[in-house]
């Protein structure tokens, strides 16, 4: 060991102080982007924040996928959740060893937003509507992610999203009303336990405003969160949030001013423009030259960042705990995932059906019976077993989704799909005989929202970039669900379809192509022809089973 910052026998704060004193101003600024610049003259590699690990490592190839966070909390078993966190950390280490440039050890998990609104489309990411349970589970998962070593972390857990974040619509410009009592009795009790225990070492603010102020500028970052943490706390922005301070929030007129205020409010790492750090570093340099920030502001942020890197053991002679590559999706991790899944199930009612008594044939019925639901932060599944497939391993099964098969008819003809998923059209109705397969759709009624799956290719109806309806989507696969419609009936037994994501209406355009229009009066009026009753089919299937 030649430099004190590389000496693991020294306290972390002494190592950070030594390293910071060796850095130039430009090198300090280079640390403040998500993709931190290397410092070759000191032998310091680049560093990347932000590996998704909400319930297993995500987005980097097949890895163990554990139950979603809300399922983990349903186990009410902190020890089990800690084991899941430890298994996730081990797999992160394997992937990091293979590709340190793209798989960093600062993990963006757990999510600790209390689930206060059932309409929030991201509730599966959090643990509970109860802040106490959320805090308990956050401590457990973060402790597993951080690892068992008392002085060195396997990964650096990050709590998100601070603060009062339960809304996706206009999430960058909407403001959450947060009275003091709600803050202190509901929101903070979910965030503070993992910070006080020292198992979470970073926090990510949320996109929204709180009481009219962007969350990325909240005084609570320095006054409350950092006061709760026993060590230096790193604060990372959410993706593109620094730029949001100028547009669309219009809180500041220029980026240098916005970034200066964010830095002074406590943001250390700017997640902006993906791996293109140049603009962010230029804005911070501009802010320094204009006197909007000082060298001390840079030192403070760099200290928070370097403290985490020191505690990750990056500068130690042996910087990583060695993990067998076969740990990824190992039998032990598969067994742990199965245990977590089993314990996450909550039995609400049982009319003598369970436990199953070795029936010879089981009817599996329902829209989700043969579907494995994933969330945005699911990892790449090494294998998939649906309810239908799992029961089929035990005994003979018969199956149907129990959905109606329909055709949608206008005065000009039927809504028609193509096998290749090109824009849909209206085609004339046949003079006699059955409706063509291309005009048949399976109707999934989610209660106020319909999804239409084209029989001709098994793909869902959505809109393309030109505003045409197409049947080319395997299912919801983006940040927002764009494959649902609202049926608006009229007194004549017909109705119109409104695309929920855009608020526009299904209409007939040029050459009988099917488009979306903002004008309700121009919407196509449809009659529904039921080709097959899902309820009737389900009853018939059920009658053949025990």
What do these predicted regions represent?
Residues 1-546:
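Glycoside hydrolase catalytic-domain context in secreted enzymes
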């Amino acid at each position: 060991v030649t430099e004190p910052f590389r000496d693991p026998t020294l306290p972390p704060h002494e190592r950070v102080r030594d390293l910071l004193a060796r850095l130039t101003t430009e090198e300090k600024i280079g640390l403040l982007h998500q993709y931190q610049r290397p410092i070759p003259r000191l032998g310091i590699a680049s560093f990347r924040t932000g590996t998704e690990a909400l319930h297993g490592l995500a987005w980097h190839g097949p890895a163990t996928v554990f139950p979603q966070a809300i399922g983990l909390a349903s186990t009410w078993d902190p020890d089990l959740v800690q084991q899941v966190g430890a298994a996730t950390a081990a797999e992160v280490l394997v992937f990091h060893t293979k590709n340190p440039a793209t798989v960093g050890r600062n993990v963006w998990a757990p999510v600790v937003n209390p689930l206060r609104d059932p309409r929030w489309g991201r509730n599966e990411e959090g643990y509970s509507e109860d802040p106490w349970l959320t805090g308990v589970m956050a401590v457990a998962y973060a402790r597993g992610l951080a690892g068992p070593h008392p002085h060195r972390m396997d990964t650096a857990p990050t709590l998100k999203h601070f603060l009062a974040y339960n809304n996706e619509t206009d999430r960058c410009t909407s403001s959450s009303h947060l009275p003091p009592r709600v803050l202190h009795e509901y929101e903070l009790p979910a965030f503070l336990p993992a910070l006080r225990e020292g198992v979470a070492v970073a926090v990510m603010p949320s996109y929204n405003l709180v009481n009219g102020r962007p969350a990325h500028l909240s005084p609570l970052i320095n006054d409350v969160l950092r006061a709760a943490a026993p060590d230096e706390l790193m604060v990372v922005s959410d993706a593109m949030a620094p730029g949001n301070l100028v547009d669309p929030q219009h809180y500041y007129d220029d980026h240098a001013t916005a970034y200066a205020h964010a830095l002074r409010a406590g943001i250390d790492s700017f997640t902006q423009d993906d791996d293109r750090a140049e603009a962010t570093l230029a804005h911070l340099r501009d802010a320094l030259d204009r006197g909007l920030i000082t060298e001390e502001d840079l030192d403070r942020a760099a200290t928070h960042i370097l403290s985490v890197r020191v505690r990750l053991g990056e500068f130690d002679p042996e910087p990583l705990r060695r993990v067998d590559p076969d740990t990824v999706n190992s039998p032990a991790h598969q067994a742990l995932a199965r245990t977590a899944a089993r314990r996450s199930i909550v039995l609400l009612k049982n009319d003598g059906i369970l436990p199953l008594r070795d029936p010879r044939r089981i009817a599996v019925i329902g829209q989700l019976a043969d579907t494995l639901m994933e969330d945005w932060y699911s990892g790449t599944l090494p294998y998939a077993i649906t309810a239908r497939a799992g029961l089929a391993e035990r005994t003979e099964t018969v199956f149907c989704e129990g959905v109606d098969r329909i055709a949608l008819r206008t005065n000009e003809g039927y809504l028609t799909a193509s096998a290749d998923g090109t824009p849909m059209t209206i085609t004339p109705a046949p003079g006699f005989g059955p409706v063509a397969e291309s005009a048949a759709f399976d109707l999934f009624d989610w209660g106020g929202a319909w999804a239409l799956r084209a029989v001709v290719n098994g793909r869902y109806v959505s809109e393309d970039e030109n505003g045409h309806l197409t049947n080319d989507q395997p299912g919801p696969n983006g940040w927002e669900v764009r494959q649902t419609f609202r049926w608006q009936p009229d007194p004549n037994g017909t109705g119109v379809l409104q695309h929920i994501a855009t608020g526009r209406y299904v209409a007939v355009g040029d050459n009988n192509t099917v488009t979306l229009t903002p004008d309700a009066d121009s919407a196509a009026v449809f009659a529904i022809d039921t080709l097959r009753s899902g309820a009737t089919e389900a009853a018939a299937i059920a009658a053949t089973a025990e």
